[in-house]
Amino acid sequence: MGNSEIYQYNKLEDANRPKGDNFAGPYIFPKMKDFQKETVDHFENKSLIQNNIEKMIKFKDRPCLGRRLKIGENEKGEPIYEKKYTYYTYEEVLNMCRKFAKNLHEKKEELITIDSYKNNKFNLVGIFAKNCTEWVVADMGCQMDSVTTATLYATLGQEAFKYICDQTKIKTILVSPDLVKLLCENKQKFKLEYLTNAILFDLTTNCDSKKELENLRKAGFTAYSFTEDFLKENKNIKNTDLLLSQPETIMTICYTSGTTGDPKGVMLSQKNMISVLETVIRDSSVPLDENGTHISFLPLAHIFERMVISGFMGVAAKVGFISGSVRTTLMEDMSILGPTLLFTVPRVLQTVRKKIFDGFDALGGWKRRLAYTAYYTKLENYKKYGIITHLIYDKLVFAKIRAMFGNKLKTILCASAPMPKELADDFKVFLSIPIIEGLGMTELSGSAFCTNYHDLNNFTAGGVTSGVKMIIKSVPDLGYTIDDVIDGINCPAGEICLKGPLIFNGYYKNDLENSKAFDEDGYFHTGDVGRIFPYYGNGLKIVDRVKEIFKLSQGEYIIPAKLESVYVKSNFIQQIMIYGNSTMNNILAIICPDKQHCARELDITEEELIKDEENPKLKKLILNDLDRLAIDANFNGLEKVKFILLTFEGFTIQNECMTPTMKIVRKKVEIRYKNRIEKLFSIMRTMSQ
């Protein structure tokens, strides 16, 4: 397939048009004619857990959840794992899920938080853990008895952890050994008296269970062993005593960053999640079947990874968990496991790409020259002709790279943040496979847009899946309208608004945000600004945000106003603007220093100070103070400023960086300092590799 071939994406639907004339659409999946009629339930009104139970029974002997067994430690005390994956079968996983559900049900009164919001009743527990077999077993066990899970993760920060616990009032939290220390610190620091029980994941996590349980008890928890207390036989409770989740049951409350700074609890139902599986099957956008293998390393606390695992289990495929971390074991794990589809984020691919090029450089001599000749030849062939294979170089050079991924990889699906085109191009060259880009958010059950498996262009995020329909609503204040013209062609732009079975059920106990999220026609306003490109098959590209918020390459949202309100308290800062985007791993700050305070602290004159905006002593002074403020404010690692750009001209009305009401015009600042930002970004990228 050549680059000139354009796959057709978003298609206009005539029926059910919302009111108003400032929108383009509705757009629907190109193979559909009528969204309302064709969004039918292929699963006969089943819940996700009902479907998964049927698959676990039908394919009981197939391998389901796998991990590499620990066989020892090296001289540094680091774990050594077997060179193979060992699996629990679908039948074994089903039995563990039922045991967990029964034992949780028996202790329901002491362990479960009972709550309600709107028309939903909740039985709540929390999960605070890394990816492991126990995570999936506990999650499905909860679904077997209509227990809703509230998910937490370490990068939330301590204040956000407290906020979620206060909002849900969870009595019980399931925790992996690596997070026990942080959990205990949070409980004691914030005096979370209602959080009284902790269940330790100790089946596959290679921990000293006795020691970690004692640590939990010292912090004031009633501590339980997942293995000893929740995987034991329970003859007191029958399967029929369990209240199996129905399609309308809220499966999970997934917390995501909010524009106010407080996390928002996104309520996702069983219907939402099975609609994702239904969409994948109906659209045939991803080559997913019972022969598939998935490596799980993206956090299960985020809905994307849960959606992926649900999809693989929904077709009775295999899932293997990462043994260590992305940096330490991911590549070795993949070479052993052999994933067929790789679900990842740009940041991980950037790390892998660096390892590949480092490997080229380490070859030296003629082998290094051969590797780079092969790379540049394939890249040029792709850009000119759309060809991603090479008869000679694929065997001589790139076969070794394919082996790094296990030799079975059919495609990579990159999500969470937009993927830079050059990154996608490199992996087409390395692996001779298509790169799919998915785009979604927690509120969309993790997925709403997807490029096609056969499309090699990777210019846009593709089109809507068959699980949503979309309108584009003009945002004239930001300069985006549905009448925009590029090169003589109408390319509508505006806020992306969506409707359909993938859309969430609202924010937990947050009436204000719920009132803002949906319009009178039932469309969810995403806050993302998108543009339709007719000459790329009506593909959609994210071009801006309606509100002042952005996402880093890890997929984490950053709220600049929240950070600026803290950092501006520094005596050494007169003005500050936090900047970042989805290709960056860290934020940077554009700062106008307070000349008087800085000069005094550095014992120089103001005239001397303003001569050098790159003064390392000045940068160190300001960075140290920002670090102090970040610690005091309990900012997480991604909210801490590690890179700064200094300017003494400041943001003014005259240079159009301030409005008459003294608000920073972020776009103008970005444009004004574009060259310096790009230079600093290049340094940041080099340092993070």
Locate predicted features.
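Structural core segment of the AMP-binding/adenylate-forming
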Residues: 2-18, 144-229, 623
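Conserved pre-ATP/AMP-binding loop-to-beta segment of ANL
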Residues: 63, 221-226, 231-255, 262, ...
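Conserved AMP-binding/adenylate-forming
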Residues: 69, 74, 79-92, 101-156, ...
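Conserved AMP-binding A3 loop
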Residues: 87-90, 251-277
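Conserved structural elements of the adenylate-forming
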Residues: 98-102, 266-287, 394, 399
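Conserved ATP-dependent adenylate/AMP-binding module captured primarily in the ANL superfamily
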Residues: 139, 156-188, 276-295, 326-340, ...
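Gly/Ser/Thr-rich phosphate-binding loop
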Residues: 221-226, 340-343, 352-457, 469, ...
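Conserved ATP-binding/catalytic segment of the ANL
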Residues: 478-481, 487-552
